[in-house]
Amino acid sequence: MKRNIAIVAGGDTSEIVVSLRSAQGIYSFIDKEKYNLYIVEMEGRRWEVQLPDGSKTPVDRNDFSFINGAEKVVFDFAYITIHGTPGEDGRLQGYFDMMRIPYSCCGVLAAAITYDKFVCNQYLKAFGVRISESLLLRQGQAVSDEDVVEKIGLPCFIKPNLGGSSFGVTKVKTREQIQPAIAKAFSEAEEVMIEAFMGGTELTCGCYKTKEKSVVFPLTEVVTHNEFFDYDAKYNGQVDEITPARISEELTRRVQTLTSAIYDILGCSGIIRVDYIITEGEKINLLEVNTTPGMTATSFIPQQVRAAGLDIKDVMTDIIENKF
């Protein structure tokens, strides 16, 4: 009998549009001869299943099921592709743990740690991972322009500590830009991270592990035409994504080894993607860890899967079957 798979998308942040795109990508990637696929949209208290005829019906949160005509369909597995809360920060993972429903990505603790950029960076720093200097501001806290310049320097990045897709991010070059950038970041989240700028080559590396194997994908080099890899660059084509990256085999191996180590240190599950900046002297610096990476047809992970000579359908099957 085919397993019923929920591709869980939506969420409660500005990244909802990106999440819904990823859901369509994942729907196209998963083997439909092996699984019954449904996209589940979540936004606040609204949990709905998209039915084949285009209509939607509510999800019963008591057992994660829905009614389709005269049939009750109970989901066997959740492929979480919410970028942001509640799917990337551990909240939804906690629900599925209580329901005893396996899911595609990291558990509660790993998701919570990686969603908090400042906490994740400080945690990995304790294991010898290089990070940039940063400050954390919580709602109601303030910092002077002088402190930012003295402790972090210019240029710097001011961004929401929680969230992704570069919403609310500003590359700050002058003192006059600091406070407006902080206000912009606070409009997206309750915590703001002020991070030192690092110039260099931006790379990203995907990885997943199952009970039988460990797979680290070829690296992608990110060359943006904008000031930085912002939303416009990510989703409107203002970037060159080169897979495999134009770097030495030795540096490639070092980045892949570090990515695998970060996976294990954090206790990850499913597919992750780790972003880096390579600075002078081939120093590898962590930018962030993504535990629910984008999965549209043109996203980094599908590109890297193709470059590795793998079939994305087989990778999706690995992720699902590893939980049974």
Curated annotation (Swiss-Prot):
Cell wall formation. NCBIfam families: D_ala_D_alaTIGR, PRK01372.1, PRK01966.1-3. ATP binds at residues 149-204. HAMAP family: Dala_Dala_lig. Mg(2+) 1 binds at D275, E288. It comes from the Bacteria. Its main location: cytoplasm. GO terms for molecular function: ATP binding; D-alanine-D-alanine ligase activity; metal ion binding. This is D-alanine--D-alanine ligase. It comes from Bacteroides fragilis (strain YCH46). Its cofactor is Mg(2+); Mn(2+). GO terms for biological process: cell wall organization; peptidoglycan biosynthetic process; regulation of cell shape.
